[in-house]
Every structure is written in structure tokens, then in C-alpha cells.
């Protein structure tokens, strides 16, 4: 089954201010896929949030992948901007929504292309 996964910055602050911020996130994403090979169909990075369409082989794979991705991104972002100890980057745990119909999957894929 495919899932729509998303997360936002705390109080909808900006996660990605400049192109280097997007590139840094994508480097973490490449590392995450190398560590936990989660099939990703599409993703979309917005200034204050992101969306993914994925098809995990297990529920554990989904949780492990996005936990590692958000934790690592947060740590590296704080290190880069010297904001360690200033609080959370994300509003909380990522959200997941199962896509049980082809129409739902197609709609989210169009949104995240």
C-alpha cells in the first residue's frame, strides 16, 4: 500500500530559505534511502513543509525512514545555522495517510510531482 507522508515546520516557520537549504535536505534524503531503502514514488519540498508518496515494505520501514530523515535533518540544520538547543524544527512526528484507491494515489502524485 502507498502512503502520503508529510511534515511541517514548527509554527509553520520556513524550513527552506534558500536553494542550499533544499540541497542540504536532499543530501540527507539520499543518505536516508541508502540506509533504509524505502521506495519513493514522488516528493515535493515547500518552504515550510514537505510531502512524500512512498510504498514501504513494512510499517517499521516507514517509521524508521522518516524518523531518521527528520531527526538527521533537524540536527544538521541546527548545526549549520548554530541554533542547537533552540527547540524543535518540525511541529511533531510526521503524518501518514494510506492511499487505498488509485484515484487518491493519482491525485497525490499530481500534487507532489
Model segments located where?
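Short catalytic/metal-binding and nucleic-acid-binding patches
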Residues: 1-113
